[in-house]
Structure formats: C-alpha cells, structure tokens
Amino acid sequence: TITPQPQSGNSKPRVFRLSDDKAIINSLGFNNKGIKKVKKNLIKHQKSYLNNKIVGVNIGKNKNSSEAIDDYLIGLEELGDLASYITINISSPNTEGLRDLQLRGKIEKLIKKIIDKRDEIKNINTKPILIKISPDLNEDQLRDIALISLANNIDGLILTNSTIKRETNLISMNKGKKGGLSGRPLYNNSNIILKKMYELTNGQIPLIGV
C-alpha cells in the first residue's frame, strides 16, 4: 500500500510465521517509499508493464496524517493514470484509526470524494475503484458498506484484509504476536464475509476474495 509520504512502518520484527497453523501475523504499517518514488518507478517501466498486463495500485494514508481523505485523493491523482485499477485500503489493522474509515459516515464521505475526484480527471475517469475491507466487520457494517458501494457505483470490493481476532485453537509459538492474522485460520470467516457481501449487493458488484 502506497502513502503520499514515505514511511518506515512499524518497528521490527513485524512479520511472524505461524507454521503449525499455516498462517502469518504481520504488523508492517504501510512501509513504503512514498508516492513520488513509486510514480517515478511506474513511469520508468510503463512501456514494459503496460503491455497486456494488469497493474493494481493500493493507496492508503500516512500514519501521522490528520487528513486521511486528502491522502487518498493525492494517491488517486498521482497514480491513477499509471494503474489499471485503484484499491482504497481502509482495512489494515496496523495503522491506528485506519479501520474507523469503514464506519458508515466516514466511508460514505470518503467514497463520494474519491468517485468525484476520479470522474473529474480526464485520464483516470474510467479507472475502476475497489475498496478493501476487514473481516472483523459485523453484519450491520457490511450492510452499510454494501449500500454505500451500490449507491456510488463502486467497481469492486476486495474481501478481506487480515484479522485482529484470534482463534482459540491456534498452536504456534507466535500466536500472541500483535498484528493482522492471515492464512488458513482466516479462510472460513473470509468466505463467510464473501457470501454475505454477495447477498447484500445482490451480486451487482464484483467481489475479489483474497
């Protein structure tokens, strides 16, 4: 996930393998080189990677940003014309306060501004916008996101990011580490979210299971 300014992410160690559970816990925290560097790299390799290839760009907010929406708008403006699609990552558990952007009032405001900005920029007004959501949302929250996505013609939903929940049957030594859990323990719940969201959107929005 790319943020406007470069940031180092959370302190190391921040990736833990749970081999016995076929899982990983990460607390990376959007470590990246920032939009300027990424844009430069994309332009440099534009001819080679755009040759019949799909290039997705995930955008997020900086850890210390006071204006989250502005960070996403900057990402869209700067990288939109270099991507095949843009993913709005509002579901990582490793940036404090980020997942609050999934709450009804906040996500509605964010999505409207993102769509308005995309539609007004000639080079990116046809680029698909996808939203990546958490597996830890309750049914009311999923319903809100479904309705808001339908109302604003969101092009797709990515289901799901990693979870902060821990199954009681985890047996690996690193099971208590802080961060987002992904892998086999998340498989069933992620598929449940996928099924629920298909029902809530009446199959009208493409869903990507990860």
List each language-model region with its residue ranges.
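Active-site glycine- and acidic-residue-rich loops that bind
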Residues: 61-74, 100, 106, 130-151
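Metal-dependent enolase-superfamily TIM-barrel catalytic cores that perform enediolate-based chemistry
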Residues: 71-120, 134
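Short beta-strand/loop segments at the ligand-binding rim of alpha/beta enzyme cores
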Residues: 50-59, 120-137, 199-209
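Active-site beta-loop-alpha junctions enriched in small/polar residues
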Residues: 2-3, 60-64, 91-93, 132-136, ...
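Conserved, mostly hydrophobic/aromatic
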Residues: 38, 57, 88-89, 132, ...
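A gly/proline- and charged-residue-enriched helix-loop-helix capping module
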Residues: 3-51
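Non-cysteine beta-strand/loop elements that form the S-adenosyl-L-methionine
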Residues: 1-10, 80-91, 155-163
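Glycine/Thr-rich beta-alpha phosphate-binding loop at enzyme active sites
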Residues: 93-106, 142, 148-205
